[in-house]
Regions:
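N-terminal nucleotide-binding beta1-loop-alpha1 segment
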Residues: 20-23
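Structural motif
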Residues: 17-18, 121
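Internal catalytic-core helix/loop-beta-alpha segment
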Residues: 77-136
Length: 191
């Protein structure tokens, strides 16, 4: 089977305090922008719009696409870095489901965290992302959804947050997901 390399580099503003990690982007045919969480069916940008602007459509360019410019400007302003836990995968089916992703090469957390010295926390946005990250952070406790645990990397003590998946396949109302994410941002003093 053919492997697929990650199509985007990490987005790491200089002021990154929070690193948000998903699993791997969907197939390009599902993208509405050339940035993270590009699938118009994914709720991440709606969740962030509700929390920070009181408007789930704050990051829409039009009804069928998110605005890459708005998303990047927001991340720079708030100190949010974005990436994924898988750098190379095999898609067992030609869809966006994490269930059919086989991780060939995971993230190198030290390499990424070295670039963002102000980062105090990592948040993962789904079970596949959590499993992949824990595989490269041995001894780290897996937090329950909506909670965090402490871990060390490169002599830094950090928080690992686990949030609900922003995928529509995770059957929770948007407002409920946003409330869980809001708790994390409040804990970090970012909202």
């Amino acid at each position: 089977m053919t492997t697929e390399l990650h199509p985007l580099g990490f987005f790491l503003p200089e002021n990154t305090r929070l690193l948000m990690l998903g699993s791997f982007p969907p197939p390009r045919a599902r993208w509405s922008m050339d940035f993270y969480y590009p699938n118009i069916q994914n709720d991440m940008w709606r969740i962030l719009g509700l929390i920070f602007y009181g408007n789930k459509d704050a990051f829409l360019r039009d009804k069928k696409a998110f605005s890459e410019e708005k998303a990047k400007a927001f991340c720079r302003e708030k100190g949010i870095g974005i990436g994924d836990t898988a750098m190379e995968v095999i898609r067992l089916k030609a869809n966006a489901s994490d269930k059919f992703l086989e991780v060939v090469r995971p993230i190198d957390p030290e390499k990424v965290l070295f670039q963002i010295p102000e980062c105090v926390a990592i948040v993962v946005t789904g079970q596949k992302a959590m499993d992949t990250l824990l595989s490269v952070l041995p001894g780290t406790e897996e937090p329950k959804v909506g909670f965090s645990s402490e871990f060390s990397c490169m002599g830094r003590t950090m928080r690992l947050f686990r949030m609900p998946s922003s995928s529509r396949a995770y059957p929770r109302p948007l407002e409920e997901k946003a409330a869980v994410y809001r708790g994390m941002f409040e804990t970090l003093g970012m909202v």
